[in-house]
Design a protein with these regions (language model features):
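Oxidoreductase and adenylate-handling cofactor-binding alpha/beta cores
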Residues: 173-192, 237-241, 370-378, 383
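Glycine-rich NAD(P)-binding loop of Rossmann-like domains
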Residues: 191-230
């Protein structure tokens, strides 16, 4: 619903005519827990009429109060919210200057805040602590991915939570697709052989010629959440690959929409040249990828993990890789992270370790802040929301 729709719903405040400047004092009506509240959405608002199209009007009145919170302080916020986004946030809200840590919050420094912006390093408090320290709080906009570590006390206390998890999923999807395309060409094993000596060049050529490439090659996905589904779409639409997927929450209709074939993990590991893990990080999935599955990998198969390390029984993966050196593991995550000194992963030729780089890095992080600013604008103006996280969703999200 646009701003004009909200204006026209105001009881005895506006007629069907275009609202005047004097009438447009408060333009957001939010029914929250049965309480009607009126807010402005910043210095300007656009009101749409059939005759006049769009006209811009100055809006005066009290605005919602917002604050940035992060245990990493200013540096943590600047990683995700660039100057342009923060300036636009200041035009939507009255801001409490500074960045506040959990200690600051418990000390009562954001008691007037109704909206919070954060990212990795979001302060973790109990439901009671939030209620005491931020009694006016209505919404949290989290410019990062998983909210599992902090969201439950807020949601159970009636605070709405929004996350940029889909924005953070874009670079993970891109990274994963790139790794799959390389793996299907035999890149990792061929690169290992070529790097040893000139004499190993012929062995590298024999190795990569045993691969099918990226035409009708079976690829397996464990998990079809936002990232898994994004990977599936790209593999099906941009490449002619046969995608097998396992996800107990995915229906046949959803699988058909994505163009994937549902299969159990045993079939996926036995059939697919490349298998990529995108399972949600919940207690039920811990240790689900074990020797019974890894031992089924094809002799030149690749296992990719950009999800979470906890789903992998690492000693079982090591065993399967040692039994068949032509197999490869590309691990952007481990459990713990990083792996402890002396772990078998270190020094194994067929293990590629990266320091959790699949997610947003550098300028990619600013996309998450920009998406949360846009979601906050939508929330204020009554437009359809895109990235809200509910208690029900939290049970199955990564």
């Amino acid at each position: 619903m646009g701003v004009w729709g909200l204006l026209s719903r105001s009881p005895q405040r506006f007629s069907n005519a275009s609202p005047t400047l004097q009438q447009a004092q408060k333009i957001r009506c939010s029914i929250y827990k049965g309480v009607r509240k009126w807010y402005t959405i910043g210095e300007t608002a656009r009101c749409r009429t059939e005759k006049k199209g769009e006209e811009t009007m100055n809006i005066k009145g009290n605005r919602l109060c917002a604050a940035y919170v992060n245990d990493g302080g200013e540096a943590g916020i600047r990683r995700v919210y660039d100057d342009a986004t923060r300036a636009q946030t200041g035009r939507l809200f009255d801001s409490i200057p500074g960045v506040f840590t959990a200690e600051d919050i418990r000390a009562g420094k954001i008691r007037d805040a109704q909206v919070l912006f954060s990212t990795w390093g979001m302060p973790v408090l109990t439901r009671e602590q939030w209620a005491d320290a931020a009694p006016k709080l209505e919404a949290v906009f989290y410019g990062a991915g998983s909210v599992r570590y902090f969201a439950e006390p807020l949601l159970s206390g009636g605070v709405r939570v929004f996350s940029a998890w889909q924005a953070n999923g874009i670079p993970v999807t891109e990274f994963t697709v790139a790794q799959i395309i390389l793996a299907n060409k035999g890149f990792y094993g061929a690169a290992r052989l070529c790097s040893r000596s000139r004499a190993d060049r012929q062995a590298a050529e024999r190795y990569f010629r045993s691969f099918r490439g990226n035409y009708d090659t079976p690829v397996g996905l464990i998990g079809l959440g936002a990232i898994g589904a994004g990977v599936a779409r790209r593999l099906v639409q941009d490449y002619r690959l046969t995608v097998y997927a396992y996800d107990p929450f995915c229906t046949q209709e959803r699988a058909a929409e994505l163009g994937v074939r549902l299969a159990d993990p045993e079939e996926i590991f036995s059939t697919c040249l490349t298998v990529s893990n995108h399972t949600a990080n919940i207690p039920a999935t811990r240790g689900m990828l074990n020797y019974a599955l890894f031992s089924r990998m094809l002799p030149n198969a690749t296992f990719i993990n950009t999800g979470r390390g906890a789903q992998v029984v690492e000693e079982d993966l090591v065993r399967a890789l040692r039994e068949e050196p032509g197999r490869t593991a590309v691990l952007d995550v481990t459990d713990p992270e990083p792996s402890p000194e002396g772990h078998p992963f270190y020094g194994m030729d067929n293990v590629i370790l990266t320091p959790h780089i699949a997610g947003s890095v550098g300028a990619e992080c600013f996309r998450m802040g920009a998406w949360m600013l846009d979601e906050a604008r939508r929330w204020l103006s009554g437009e359809p929301l895109r990235y809200e996280v509910t208690e029900k969703m939290l049970a199955t999200m990564a």
